[in-house]
Each structure stands twice: as C-alpha cells, then as structure tokens.
C-alpha cells in the first residue's frame, strides 16, 4: 500500500518517461535535452530541459526525480528500472511467489503511512466550510422496514438469519440467509413498476422515499427546495441480477420473451435515476459500485457534493438483492458461505473461532444528508453530523486483505484527518467484520494499531444479526451507527462465544446491549478488490 502521492505519481511517471524517451535519441552515454516545439514558452523550456534521457537506469531515476519530485514515486521506481510499476522482472514466478513479493513490499507501504501520519496534523475544517448533517433515514432489512424497528431488534440481539424461502435451494450446501420475508412497495412504488423492476431497485426506491418521510420532507416542504441542488447517489454491488437472470432464462426460449426493460433495470445506476425522476431532483445523480464498500463510497461522495456547494440535499446509500440461485451459487462456488443450515441464527459469528463463513443478506439503507443551514431553515430534526471519511485500496489481492492491514490503517488515519478529530475522540466503531477469519482478524489488528488501548472504545458488528448485505451493508450499518448516537445504546455482538486468539473482548460489545455516550463513531466497509472505506459521524452540537 502506498500513499496518495505515489498512487498518482507512478502512472504519471510512466507516461512522462515514455513521452520524453519518444522525443529524445540517445546512444552510448550521450545526453540530449528534450526538444521543444517552436511555440513553447520559455518557462516550459527551462522546466523540460531538466528531462534529459540517457541509456541505463540512472538516467531514468534522474528523470523521475527532477521532473516529478514525489517521494514515494522515486522510492518505488528505483534502479531496477520501470518494471516495478507493473510487477516482477521474472516471468517464471508462480502466483504464490508473486503474492509473497507483494506482501514483502508492505514495509514500504507502512513507511509511507508513517509519513502520512506525521503530515496529517489534526485540524478542524475551516469555520466557513459547509457542514453536513443527517436528517432522515430509511431501511429495508430482515429485521425491520424502518430505522426504529430495525434498531430495536438489534438492541435485543434478535437475528434476521433464517432458511431461504424465496426459491428451492435444497441442492445447495448453503440454505440460509438474511432474507427479507415480508416486503411491500404499496404506497411507495407504482404497481406497474413493481412488477417489472428488480428487487434491488424496489428496495432502493422504498428506502429512499422512507428516508424523505422520516426527514419530514413532504410535498409542501420539497416545493421549497432548489431541485437543481438536490441529488441521489445510491449504489449497488451487484445490480439487477434477478432481471438479468430472468432474461437469460427467457432467451433460452426466444428473445421475444425477454423483458424489454432488462437492460436498463439491470444496471446499477438506474435506481438512483428512477428515484430522481420521481422526485424531479436535477442535482448530482449517479451510482458507485465498489463491492461491499459501495454504500460508504456513496455517502462520502454525497457529503462532498454538499461541502463543495454542488448540492444542498442528497439521498445516499446502497441496495442489493442477490438471494437468488445465481447469487447463492456464485458465493457457494467461492467457498465463502456458512453452511450452518440447522442453526441459522448462530451462523454469523464475527471474531468467533467456530465461524465457518459469512451469511448473505439483502436490503437497502438510505440516508438523507443535508447542509446544516438548509436543514435548520426548514426546522428539520438533526440526528447526527457527518464529519468526514476516506477511501484507500489494498492493491494486494481480489478477495484477501493486505497481510499488514496497511490499506485499512491508512484509510482510518485519513478519515480521522478528514474529520479533524483525534483517535481518542472515537469511542464507538461499527466494524465491517463479516464472519470470515482473515477479514475479522485483520480489521481487529488494524483497529488495535490505530486506537491502541482506549478503555472507552466499543466495537460491534451488525452483520452478526443480519448477515452481509453486500453493497447495502455500509448504509444499513450507518443507520445503526446514527441510531447508536441518538439512543445512547450500542447493540450486542451475538454468537461471540469463543473469541479468536489475540482478540481483547473488553474492546468488543458483549452479548447484551451496552450504554455508551458516543463522542464520535467510525463505520468501516471493505470490498472485494481491496476497496477500503471509513466514515465518521458524531452528535450534532
């Protein structure tokens, strides 16, 4: 894992070197300056005159150092020429050797992170910066269809994991999930659309409109909004898999049997688009898909749109509905799922040695984010303030976390810097913790690295009760985080009976809910591809 400057500098150096070499000609040890076009400015001429290219790696190093003075870039593009940008020089290395090489470079990544920590002085954002607050929430989950019911079930330690009933899964080794048993779009989505849309879109539209209702945004209130500054950013990891699956089945008979809406209703962006069309909102509108980190990416980007003045109001979050044959089969093929079919409520077990995989869930979570003065002007109830967040990439493996937790640590450190708070101010963390050995342990180690022995800190995993909602996980867990701030109660970790070795259980919430006066709360979400995200909420003051 490298710092931000390296992540931008390395590709830039590659192209700059290629460009300079293409216009220069070298032989032996001679040096020739890059020629300028006849119309070039004198300042550019002086700058580019530094970019001399000679044969051998030393000249390339000089070029990188003189033209693009990025510390991490010169560190990773050293005398071994440019092959380090793309991988090992040896083509004979097998997969395991290549992965070991990547892990071996983690020391460099950690060094860059230390540089980041030294540079990131905790500073409060300028007073003139627009503040972002949460004024509404909507959910569709296996534990409830509104934030209050959902969180009350979490506080009671109730599990939403059960036998799958939506289709016959008797031939699958996994037959359990966090399936939503009773779902209705009545009053939220037109019946005609309900019959045609994928369930992920129905969850999204329903949760989005419920967030507006929860925020007191009636038709009369919305009439006062500047709709060019109202946006929707609700993502999905998998999109309309059921619509696509049904289209394939229809195509086996004839293309004439296919749903004419199968293409638009399968894309991940169409949910946000349909909600904006329904509301007439003309501000930022798109979707993000970063696997299980999707929701946090959407929430942070939405907040940034508000901070930059591009929007006053944003509906943001995530939605996924993949408890269907192709979705279940895909994760079974990955050997990622729990097979505790005879005791489904005990299947999701973050930080417990008796885990045997994660449990799929489904649903949607949507936050109504609003610029503070906009919210105050209309008399909105403010649930919490959004302080900041961060994204990073492990750049290591498709599904496994970085062995040093470098990407997660860097993400948390940057989130704290973005929020302008110290690590001591965080006393609640809603962890990603999916009930997989590698993921649970690496996240715990990253938290221990970042926060040390803070006796006030409490950590829990919402997934212990609802399973993993994939692209919707972060948003639903953000709702749980905001509810913890509002109520002063944090929900338990269920099924934590035999903690992993090295895990300090004093850090983790026990089997019962606990009272906690939250100063600031961190919510983590990580996704396949090494996507890391951390967002921070606090009580509004």
From Swiss-Prot:
Disruption phenotype: Lethal when homozygous due to embryo abortion before the torpedo stage. Converts temperate oilseed composition (rich in unsaturated 18-carbon fatty acids) to that of a palm-like tropical oil (enriched in saturated 16-carbon fatty acids). PROSITE patterns: KS3_1, KS3_2. GO terms for cellular component: chloroplast; chloroplast stroma; cytosol; plastid. Its EC number is 2.3.1.41. Residues 129-539 form the Ketosynthase family 3 (KS3) domain. Residues 1-103 form a transit peptide. GO terms for biological process: cold acclimation; embryo development ending in seed dormancy; fatty acid biosynthetic process; unsaturated fatty acid biosynthetic process. It is found in: Plastid, Chloroplast stroma. It holds the Pfam family ketoacyl-synt. CDD domains: KAS_I_II (cd00834). SUPFAM superfamilies: Thiolase-like. The active site is at residues 292, 432, 468. It comes from the Eukaryota. It catalyses: a fatty acyl-[ACP] + malonyl-[ACP] + H(+) = a 3-oxoacyl-[ACP] + holo-[ACP] + CO2. Mostly expressed in siliques, and, to a lower extent, in leaves, stems, flower buds, and flowers. One of its GO terms (molecular function) is 3-oxoacyl-[acyl-carrier-protein] synthase activity. Keywords: Acyltransferase, Chloroplast, Developmental protein, Fatty acid biosynthesis, Fatty acid metabolism, Lipid biosynthesis, Lipid metabolism, Plastid, Transferase, Transit peptide. Essential protein that catalyzes the condensation reaction of fatty acid synthesis by the addition to an acyl acceptor of two carbons from malonyl-ACP. Confers resistance to low temperatures by maintaining chloroplast membranes integrity. Involved in the regulation of fatty acids ratios during seed metabolism. Required for embryo development, especially at the transition from the globular to the heart stage. NCBIfam families: fabF (TIGR03150), PRK06333.1 (NF004970), PRK07314.1 (NF005589). Belongs to the thiolase-like superfamily. Beta-ketoacyl-ACP synthases family. Homodimer. This is 3-oxoacyl-[acyl-carrier-protein] synthase II, chloroplastic. It comes from Arabidopsis thaliana.
């Amino acid at each position: 894992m490298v710092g931000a400057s390296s992540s931008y500098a390395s590709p830039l150096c590659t192209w700059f070197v290629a460009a300079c070499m293409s216009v220069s000609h070298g032989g032996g040890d001679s040096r020739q300056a890059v020629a300028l076009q006849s119309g070039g400015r004198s300042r550019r001429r002086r700058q580019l005159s530094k970019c001399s290219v000679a044969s051998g790696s030393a000249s390339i190093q000089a070029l990188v150092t003189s033209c693009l003075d990025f510390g991490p870039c010169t560190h990773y593009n050293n005398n071994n020429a440019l092959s380090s940008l793309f991988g090992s020089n040896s083509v004979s290395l097998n997969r395991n050797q290549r992965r070991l090489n990547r892990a071996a470079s983690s020391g460099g990544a950690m060094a860059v992170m230390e540089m980041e920590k030294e540079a990131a002085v905790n500073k409060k954002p300028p007073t003139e910066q627009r503040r972002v607050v949460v004024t509404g929430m909507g959910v569709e989950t296996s534990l409830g269809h509104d934030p209050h019911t959902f969180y009350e079930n979490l506080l009671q330690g109730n599990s939403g994991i059960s036998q799958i009933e939506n289709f016959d899964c008797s031939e699958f080794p996994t037959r359990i999930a966090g399936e939503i048993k009773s779902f209705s779009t009545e009053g939220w989505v037109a019946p005609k659309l309900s019959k045609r849309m994928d369930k992920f879109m129905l969850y999204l539209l329903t949760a989005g409109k419920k967030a507006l209702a929860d925020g007191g945004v009636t038709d009369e209130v919305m009439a006062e909004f500047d709709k060019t500054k109202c946006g929707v950013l609700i993502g999905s990891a998998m999109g309309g898999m059921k619509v696509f699956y049904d289209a394939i089945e229809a195509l086996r008979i004839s293309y004439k049997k296919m749903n004419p809406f199968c293409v638009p209703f399968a894309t991940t962006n169409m949910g946000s688009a349909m909600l904006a069309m329904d509301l007439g909102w003309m501000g930022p509108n798109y979707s993000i898909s970063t696997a299980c980190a999707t929701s946090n990416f959407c929430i942070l980007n939405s907040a940034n749109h508000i901070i930059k003045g591009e929007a006053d109001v944003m509906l943001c979050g995530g939605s996924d509905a993949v408890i269907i044959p192709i979705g279940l089969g895909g994760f079974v093929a990955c050997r990622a799922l729990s097979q505790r079919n005879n005791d489904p409520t005990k299947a999701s077990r973050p930080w417990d040695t008796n885990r045997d995989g994660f449990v799929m869930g489904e649903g949607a979570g949507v936050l109504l984010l609003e610029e503070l003065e906009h919210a105050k002007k209309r008399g909105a109830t403010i649930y919490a303030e959004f302080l900041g967040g961060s994204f990073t990439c492990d750049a290591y493996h498709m599904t496994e976390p970085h062995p040093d937790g470098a990407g997660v640590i860097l993400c948390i450190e940057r989130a704290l810097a973005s929020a302008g708070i110290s690590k001591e101010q965080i006393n609640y963390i809603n962890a990603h913790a999916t009930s997989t050995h590698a993921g649970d342990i690496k996240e715990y180690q990253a938290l221990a690295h970042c926060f040390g022995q803070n006796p006030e800190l409490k950590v829990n995993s919402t997934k212990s009760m609802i399973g993993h909602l994939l692209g919707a996980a972060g948003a639903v867990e953000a709702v749980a985080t905001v509810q913890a701030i509002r109520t002063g109660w944090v929900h338990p970790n269920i099924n934590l009976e035999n903690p992993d070795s090295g895990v300090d259980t004093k850090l983790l919430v026990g089997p019962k809910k606990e009272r906690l006066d939250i100063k600031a709360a961190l919510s983590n979400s990580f996704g396949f591809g090494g996507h890391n995200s951390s967002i921070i909420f606090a009580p509004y003051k």
